[in-house]
Amino acid sequence: MARKGTRIEAVMSEIRSRIASRAVVPGVRLPSVRAQAEALRVSVSTVVEAYERLVAEGLLTSRPGSGFYVAGPVAPLALAEMGPKVDRAVDPLWVSRQSLESDARVLKPGCGWLPASWMYEAGVRRALRSLARADTVELAEYATPQGHPGLRQFLARRLATAGIDASPEQVLLTESGTQAIDLVCRFLLEPGDTVLVDDPCYFNFHALLKAHRVHVVGVPNTPQGPDLDAFDAALAAHAPRLYITNSGIHNPTGAVLSPLVAHRLLKLADRAGLVIVEDDIFADFETSPAPRLAAFDGLSRVIQIGSFSKTVSASLRCGYIAAKPAWTDGLTDLKIATNFGGGRLGAEVVLSAITDSGYRKHMETVRVRLTEAMDQAVHRLATLGITPWIVPQAGMFLWCRLPDGADAAAVARACLQDGVVLAPGNAFSQSASAGDYLRFNVAQSREARIFEVLAKALSTAERG
């Protein structure tokens, strides 16, 4: 059984999350200590102590004889302050900023993209030269509401090769994969709704869902997909509206969804009326196709999203949503309301690049390089006592456990001082249960200095 201090902190974390997501708003009375204790299956004294500590933090007010109430409002979009107080080193926003703001001298084994030299630069340059000769409409006009017709037709054909039957009219282009998820959240969610995510999952899911002020529940992940018993229990306990996942190459673990888990997952989702968002941005890194929930479901309750930032260029902001027609229509209206016409140039360049005769060969080369980099990273990490959760079939990520329960956040802070940006496990974990894990990007982990700095940080952590 967990220590009482841990139980108190868990109650506080749950209440902070509800306040941050606007599931409970300023002025609302919280459940009585007895009712809260029964709901959370803890003692009354644990809830009393948690409530009193939250009063001391200024999140609650106590009214003698009446109960405990939510205090003043959460500042609009103060994302770093929303939710439980966490070490800044495991805050998803902080981790993203360290990777995005660092200069070329900083090594980034914790980032989520390929080195610039691995991207399809030659194809992008050819596309830009071709576009420079295009007529004025291509260079100056807004895109149509759903986006470039040619790119949507291409995506419909590509989806068909994955077993997903979608017409071009069911495809909506967006400015990025992140915008695609943001639009879906705006379309389907209200503040206070519950969303399921994998635990661990891509850390920007946490940041984005904070912005939508929803209640997030993590479901433990396995090498074959989500733990279905835990998933079923979460459906019963929380009545979630949405589940966001990667079914191809999972971020951060590199795991692949098994067909058996996919079928059982969809049955559970159908019974609960759950909508699934399938983030498929790593599809081009696969060496053999993984099952797709959207293929099994036929885009009935599954929405698939993707982008081209991982393989073509991160500077070309272009993604997509594939959904059933009624939803695509509503999402298109929402895109106009929030983004108006969208970009045309990016879609033109992306289409030209990915239909270029060299793109397929380029990706074959990238997949080979990733396999070599994966083998090298596993070997180098093993010399430091760092072990992978699994060795993935494909992709760029290794989800690794540090030796002797070392604190990944402390190791990341130490490495940052020496110009190495890492991604600590709890940035990915809704339950904060990955404190001794790091995610490594093998394509960004080829420099020997990374492992020298990491060895030094681990040694310091052991002495500490």
Each language-model region and where it sits:
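Short loop segments at secondary-structure junctions
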Residues: 73-75, 308, 323-327, 356, ...
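N-terminal basic, amphipathic alpha-helical segments
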Residues: 1-130, 332, 336-342, 372, ...
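Hydrophobic residues in well-ordered beta-strands that form the structural core
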Residues: 197, 218, 276-278, 422-424
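Conserved PLP-binding active-site segment of the aspartate aminotransferase-like
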Residues: 37, 42, 323, 399-405, ...
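Conserved core of the PLP fold type I
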Residues: 138-272, 284-299, 303, 461-463
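Conserved glycine-rich beta-strand-loop-beta hairpin in the small C-terminal domain of fold type I
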Residues: 368-378, 388-401
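Conserved core segment of the aminotransferase class I/II
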Residues: 124, 298-368
